[in-house]
Regions:
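The canonical Cys-X-X-Cys-His
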Residues: 87-91
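Membrane-targeting and insertion segments and their boundary/processing signals
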Residues: 49, 57, 61-64, 85, ...
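A short alpha->loop->secondary-structure connector
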Residues: 95-105, 146
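Conserved AdoMet/S-adenosylmethionine-binding subsite of the radical SAM
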Residues: 108-246
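Non-catalytic surface loops within mature trypsin-like serine protease
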Residues: 39-41, 82, 157, 180
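Short pre-active-site segment immediately N-terminal to redox-active cysteine/selenocysteine motifs
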Residues: 79-82, 86
Length: 249
């Protein structure tokens, strides 16, 4: 179903600015954002994939990967179509880059009941970037908490203060998955993102403004995204901003 988004601003001349991710797409009437699932219809921003689940699987939590939050638990993983990144090597390309709105119609209550029926301990919003369908994820997440399930995002971290604030309403854990250690040239050439800085800003926003458990991964792409220099910079950032230096000898 189509539902009006929450994370957006109205501009002049019936234009809108999406604030779900750091692209901040400004859209005229009938224009669709880069993600392919949020668009301007009659001067309001609609989410075209609300309740459209393109994939649903039960996974071990470690597959997300999440390794320090309820290890050994089972997760019901869901996704919609679309993504705000254009990774040329994407493993889930058929989902993330699909430009046709498809999927099984499911209400938040049905998503959660499916998770319960499969014996899952929580729900992961994954396979594509969940921040672009965050309004649907939030509604699922609220119901999930009522059923004593936890919620996980597997995210590229290219988010905004507004999306982080909404995450804080329902999210228990987030894995922010860096690509190529956020080397700027790699990010621009292979992902279509002009600047990786919003990822770092998102992590600090989550740390400072929420109680969400954070895990960080880094996808190394051999030959094109394997800079040792930027891997060291990323490690230094994690150590300086998230490390418990008192425990380091």
């Amino acid at each position: 179903m189509v539902k009006e988004a929450i994370l957006y601003e109205k501009l002049s001349n019936n234009k809108v600015r999406c604030t779900a991710c750091a692209r901040y797409c400004e859209l005229k009437e009938e224009q669709i954002g880069l993600c392919g699932i949020r668009g301007n219809q009659n001067g309001k921003l609609d989410l075209f994939v609300y309740g459209k689940v393109i994939a649903g699987h039960v996974d071990p939590i470690e597959k997300k990967p999440v390794t320090h939050y309820y290890p050994g638990s089972k997760i019901y993983s869901i996704a919609t179509t679309g993504c705000n990144w254009l990774c040329k090597y994407c493993q889930n390309y058929d989902i993330s880059q699909r430009r046709k709105i498809e999927g099984t119609d499911m209400t938040p209550e049905e998503v959660v009941q499916t998770a319960v029926d499969t014996g899952a301990d929580g729900i992961a919003y994954t396979y594509n970037e969940p921040s672009i369908f965050i309004e649907f994820a939030r509604d699922c997440g609220v119901v999930a908490h009522q059923k004593n399930l936890f919620n996980i995002f597997v995210s590229n971290g290219y988010d905004t203060p507004g999306s982080v604030k909404m995450m804080g309403e329902f999210l228990d854990t987030i894995t922010v998955d860096f690509k190529g250690s956020a080397e700027p040239e790699f990010i621009r050439k292979f992902i279509g993102v002009p600047d990786p800085q919003p990822i770092f800003d998102t992590l600090l926003e989550i740390r400072d403004k929420t109680k969400i458990h954070v895990e960080i991964t880094d996808l190394i792409v051999p030959q094109v995204g394997d800079s040792l220099e930027y891997a060291e910079k990323l490690c230094r950032f994690v150590y300086d901003e998230f490390g418990d230096r008192k425990s380091v000898v």
